[in-house]
A protein has these predicted regions:
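Residue-level signal for secondary-structure boundary elements
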Residues: 12, 102-105, 118-119
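Acidic/histidine-enriched, glycine/proline-rich intrinsically disordered or flexible terminal extensions
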Residues: 110-124
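GST-like fold's C-terminal all-alpha helical module
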Residues: 3-98
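Juxtamembrane helix-loop transition sites at the ends of transmembrane segments
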Residues: 29, 90, 102, 120-123
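Charged phosphate-binding loop/patch that engages nucleotide di/tri-phosphates or the phosphate backbone
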Residues: 96-112
Length: 124
């Protein structure tokens, strides 16, 4: 449960600040600085996940696949560019999760949804 909450609150928060910087600033000129700070926070939080997976992986619960692995996969589809650096343990967890037979259709549906969002734009 700890990792699921971590992803939902700590990892997701800077993603929202980056994508919706205009919602978190009083002056339009501050949005880019906020995006940079969000990227810094995301990188720090992604690094904590990386360290955990290096120590305990390949999944969040070692050899046991779990819901936080799905959350990591989904988050990685739209936010990995926020992180600066290399994250091979995250990449491996994402690869393993994405290749699971029951996850494939879920991921395909998620990616179609991202495509629809991209075609209409991010709500302001």
């Amino acid at each position: 449960l700890d990792w699921l909450v971590y992803h939902a609150t700590e990892v997701q928060e800077p993603v929202k600040r980056s994508f919706y910087a205009h919602r978190h600033t009083l002056r339009a000129g501050d949005a880019e600085a906020l995006r940079k700070r969000a990227s810094d926070l995301f990188t720090q939080r992604w690094a904590l996940v990386e360290d955990h997976l290096v120590q305990a992986g390949p999944y969040h619960l070692g050899e046991r696949f779990s819901l936080p692995d799905i959350y990591l996969l989904v988050t990685s589809t739209y936010s990995k560019d926020l992180a600066r650096g290399e994250f091979p343990a995250i990449d491996e967890c994402v690869r393993r999760t994405a290749s699971r037979q029951r996850i494939v259709p879920i991921l395909e549906d998620h990616l179609r949804g991202l495509g629809r969002i991209a075609s209409v734009g991010v709500p302001q």
